[in-house]
């Protein structure tokens, strides 16, 4: 019974050795390779006659990570006993001459004959995922900081600068009525007009930065305010349809929806050459979907209008931060549909 179990274990180990993606190499005490599985041949090929080369692994190794350096040959793992039976990161050159990171283990398995096993697992995909997660985390922090600063400046403009200017306007009107001088009255009238225009411009800038209604009342209120201002400033009619009414969502989701729609509307204004844009926001309780539709010029996704590329890329980046997705459907002379969907 024991023999049968041993044979079964031997067969299992043999199957693992032959089929695993883990690269397994056996070397003697001189550093000559005496055996390796097929997976290891991505790095060490039989044509190179590595079984006759002393310290064969060194010829493909680009260093390992230690406590001092990311890539180093100092205190080589082939010579030190400190790394025995422990995992470490090593950089190996593949047969295609690409340098890739691996999680490695180098351990003596037969002291009497001086045989050691060197195993490698490719960690490039994990590192790429970690880098992407880190980039997304940094992007999230950057956008959050940007939105917070927009909010601060917007409120400062609305609560402080505009109020001060309104006070100046009141003082100017009082001055005009106190002194009945014709020239003074005409000058005051002109200054009032300039001041009124400046107040409107600052109000618009405040809303562009970040409307207070987005934080206080939600998406629908923010859009109604923004679209009204947009129509007054640019003469572009926006047809808005929504079923979200007073519904509130996570602050980050509301910000993404607002910014993506804002970018889509502004792109349509600049490039579509239309008089009307259709915007819709709907939710079924499981997701929120926003659409920006124009019946204008359209464009090729491979050759989008100059200046719009960063905006389209920014839409997708923002959407990814809340596990959302942006789809752009466009046809020359038929228009563009930008669809954002976010799970909630």
UniProtKB/Swiss-Prot annotation:
[4Fe-4S] cluster binds at residues 58, 61, 73, 76. The modification Phosphohistidine is found at residue 158. GO terms for molecular function: 4 iron, 4 sulfur cluster binding; ATP binding; iron ion binding; phosphorelay sensor kinase activity; protein dimerization activity. It is an enzyme of class 2 (transferase). Its EC number is 2.7.13.3. It catalyses: ATP + protein L-histidine = ADP + protein N-phospho-L-histidine. Keywords: 4Fe-4S, ATP-binding, Cytoplasm, Iron, Iron-sulfur, Kinase, Metal-binding, Nucleotide-binding, Phosphoprotein, Transferase, Two-component regulatory system. Pfam families: HATPase_c (PF02518), HisKA_3 (PF07730). GO terms for cellular component: cytoplasm; membrane. Residues 147-344 form the Histidine kinase domain. It is found in: Cytoplasm. Binds 1 [4Fe-4S] cluster. The keyword Disulfide bond does not apply. Its cofactor is [4Fe-4S] cluster. Autophosphorylated. Member of the two-component regulatory system NreB/NreC involved in the control of dissimilatory nitrate/nitrite reduction in response to oxygen. NreB functions as a direct oxygen sensor histidine kinase which is autophosphorylated, in the absence of oxygen, probably at the conserved histidine residue, and transfers its phosphate group probably to a conserved aspartate residue of NreC. NreB/NreC activates the expression of the nitrate (narGHJI) and nitrite (nir) reductase operons, as well as the putative nitrate transporter gene narT. This is Oxygen sensor histidine kinase NreB. It comes from Staphylococcus epidermidis (strain ATCC 35984 / DSM 28319 / BCRC 17069 / CCUG 31568 / BM 3577 / RP62A). The gene is nreB.
């Amino acid at each position: 019974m024991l023999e049968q179990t041993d044979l079964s274990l031997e067969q299992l180990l043999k199957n693992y050795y032959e089929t695993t993606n883990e690269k397994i190499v056996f070397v003697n005490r001189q550093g000559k390779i005496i055996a390796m599985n097929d997976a290891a041949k991505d790095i060490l090929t039989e044509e190179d006659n590595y079984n006759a080369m002393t310290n064969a692994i060194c010829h493909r190794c680009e260093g390992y990570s230690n406590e001092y350096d990311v890539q180093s040959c100092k205190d080589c793992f082939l010579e030190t006993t400190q790394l025995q039976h422990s995992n470490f990161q090593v950089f190996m050159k593949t047969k295609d001459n690409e340098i890739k990171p691996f999680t490695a283990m180098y351990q003596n398995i037969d002291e009497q004959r001086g045989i050691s096993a060197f195993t490698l697992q490719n960690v490039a995909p994990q590192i790429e995922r970690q880098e992407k997660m880190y980039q997304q985390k940094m992007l999230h922090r950057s956008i959050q900081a940007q939105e917070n600063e927009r909010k601060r400046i917007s409120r400062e403009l609305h609560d402080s600068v505009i109020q001060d200017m309104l006070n100046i306007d009141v003082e100017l009107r009082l001055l005009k009525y106190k002194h009945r001088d014709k020239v003074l009255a005409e000058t005051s009238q002109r200054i009032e007009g300039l001041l009124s225009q400046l107040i409107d411009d600052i109000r618009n800038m405040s809303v562009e930065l970040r409307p207070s209604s987005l934080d206080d009342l939600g998406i629908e209120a923010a859009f109604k305010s923004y679209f009204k201002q947009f129509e007054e400033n640019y003469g572009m009619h926006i047809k808005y349809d929504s079923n979200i009414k007073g519904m509130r969502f996570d602050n980050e989701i509301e910000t993404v929806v607002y910014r993506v729609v804002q970018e889509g509307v502004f792109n349509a204004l600049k490039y579509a050459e239309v008089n009307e844009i259709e915007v819709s926001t709907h939710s079924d309780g499981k997701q929120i979907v926003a659409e920006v539709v124009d019946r204008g010029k359209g464009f090729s996704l491979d050759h989008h209008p100059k200046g719009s590329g960063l905006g389209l890329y920014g839409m997708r980046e923002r959407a990814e931060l809340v596990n959302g997705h942006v789809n752009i459907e466009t046809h020359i002379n038929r228009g563009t549909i930008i669809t954002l969907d976010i799970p909630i």
